[in-house]
Amino acid sequence: MSGTLAERIQRLEDIEAIRRLKYRYMSYADDGYDADGIVSLMTPDAVWDGGEAFGRQEGAEAFGNMVREVGKQISFAAHLALNEIIDVDGDTARGQWWLLMPCTAQNDEGKDEARWIFASYDDRLVKRDGQWLFAHTIFDVKTFCAHKDGWAEA
């Protein structure tokens, strides 16, 4: 870590702020998929790309609408963000996390079942008016499987 002591402290404070931002995102998702709360953590023009599993949403409001729909299908979720790597460069940053998420989601017949999601997040963030916000997220689902089947069968 190079730079003055003040720059190094600022970088550490930024890393902690980004970590807390991600945890707020996860908490809003775990609290009934609070779309308004999640959107408040994003730039208005944010992009959220969930690939084939969840699609690409351009703009925070579009993502908020998708979150509301997901919330209708997932009645319980515990978003566990793990193994973060956060790199800060001035007012921009990149954060990477693994997601382990046990949840209760509707199956193809519309019945609730215990499921697992294993995925990765690759976030680009910007600092605006002293606040870190998500600007671009790639959400890469590795598996979304029924608990009883396990991920080896999915």
Spell out what each predicted region is.
Residues 34-101:
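A solvent-exposed, acidic/Ser-Thr-rich amphipathic alpha-helical stretch
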Residues 14, 30-31, 45, 49, ...:
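Acidic side chains
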Residues 1-4, 8, 21, 46-50, ...:
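A near-ubiquitous, low-amplitude feature marking generic local secondary-structure context
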Residues 8, 12, 54-57, 112:
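Charge-dense, low-complexity intrinsically disordered segments
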Residues 3-6, 72-154:
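A beta-strand edge to alpha-helix "cap/lid" segment located at domain peripheries
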Residues 1-35, 40:
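Short, low-complexity N-terminal intrinsically disordered segments enriched in polar/charged residues
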